[in-house]
C-alpha cells in the first residue's frame, strides 16, 4: 500500500513528492499524538475520579467527551503574561525546547511492522539522545523566569533527570545485548522468536520475563523522567507551587503540559516495544494474528498509561533526598549487576536469545 502511494505520488508531483510525503507522514503522526494527549488528560481525570468514588468530568458534551476541547479553548483564550524581570527571548524559547524533542522522537517509533516514518538502524540511540534534550528547556525556563521557585525547580529537574537517565540507559543496553540491534523494529521481531514463540506463547517470549528487573527499572525511571507523581518534586505544589512553570501562563504554560503528556506516551510506547513485544499479540492464533498489530500496541500503551495514573492516585510524593537515593543507590547498582548477569547469560550454554 505504502509503495503504491509512493509510486503514484512520484508520478503526480515529481520532484516535489519527497518533501511533501515527509510532511504528510509528519502530520499523520503529530495530529493523532495531540488527540491522544487531549483524551489522555480526560482519561486521567475520569480514572482518578472513579478511584475517589466521583464521576469525573461529565458536563461538556456527552459523557464529558468534549471536555478536552473546552480545556484547549480556555488555554488558547488566556492571556500570556510576561513578568517584568524575565529574559524574554529565553523565556519564550524554553517551552519549545521542551516540546520539540518530545515530538521529534516519534520519527523513529514503529507502530507495526514496516509502519514507521524513518526506519533507521540507530533508532534506539536516536530516542535516547533526543529525549534527553528536553531537560535543557526546563533548566532554561527556570533561569529565564528570574524566580527563586522556578530556579529551584529547574535545578531539581537537572539532578533528577541525570540520575534516572543513567539507569534507563543501562536498562536499554541490556535490550540491545539480547536483541543484537539498535533498530526498534528488529528489537520487536527478536522478542517474537524462540521456544515459547514457536509454541504460540508470545507473552513468555518477550523481554519482560528474562529482563524483569530492567523492565521495572525502566518504567519507574520513565515515571521519574516525566516528572510524574510520586517523583514530581520539580513542580511540587506544596513546596515550590509549579516549579519551573510558575511564571508561565496561557499557551506557554500549556506547552509544558503538552510535552509532559507526550513524554508519558513515549515512555509507555518504548516500554511496550522494548519489553512487551510491541505490536505482537500475547498468544499466537489464527484469530489474534488476524488483528492488526497496531491494535495490540495501542492496548499495551493504554494499560501502561493507566498504570501511570494509578501510581499518581496511590502514592505520596517522595522527598527529594529519597528520589536521589533511589536513583543512585538502588537503580544504578541494580542495572549494572543485571547487565553483568545478562552478559554472562548470553555467553553461557543456557543462552535463550541467539
From Swiss-Prot:
Membrane spanning stretches: 22-42, 91-111, 124-144, 162-182, 203-223, 250-270, 291-311, 326-346
Encoding gene, per UniProt annotation: nuoH
Matching PANTHER family: NADH DEHYDROGENASE SUBUNIT 1 (PTHR11432), NADH-UBIQUINONE OXIDOREDUCTASE CHAIN 1 (PTHR11432:SF3)
Main location: membrane
Family to which the UniProt record says this protein belongs: Belongs to the complex I subunit 1 family.
Complex formation: NDH-1 is composed of 14 different subunits. Subunits NuoA, H, J, K, L, M, N constitute the membrane sector of the complex.
Any Pfam family matching the protein: NADHdh
Species of origin: Cupriavidus metallidurans (strain ATCC 43123 / DSM 2839 / NBRC 102507 / CH34)
Reaction catalysed by this enzyme: a quinone + NADH + 5 H(+)(in) = a quinol + NAD(+) + 4 H(+)(out)
Keywords carried by this UniProt record: Cell inner membrane, Cell membrane, Membrane, NAD, Quinone, Translocase, Transmembrane, Transmembrane helix, Ubiquinone
Subcellular location: Cell inner membrane
Gene Ontology molecular-function annotations: NADH dehydrogenase activity; oxidoreductase activity, acting on NAD(P)H, quinone or similar compound as acceptor; quinone binding
Membrane topology, from the record: Multi-pass membrane protein
One GO term of the biological process aspect: aerobic respiration
Origin: domain of life: Bacteria
Enzyme Commission number(s) of this protein: 7.1.1.-
Name recorded for this polypeptide: NADH-quinone oxidoreductase subunit H
GO cellular component annotations of the record: plasma membrane
Function: NDH-1 shuttles electrons from NADH, via FMN and iron-sulfur (Fe-S) centers, to quinones in the respiratory chain. The immediate electron acceptor for the enzyme in this species is believed to be ubiquinone. Couples the redox reaction to proton translocation (for every two electrons transferred, four hydrogen ions are translocated across the cytoplasmic membrane), and thus conserves the redox energy in a proton gradient. This subunit may bind ubiquinone.
Record InterPro entries: NADH_UbQ_OxRdtase_su1/FPO, NADH_UbQ_OxRdtase_su1_CS
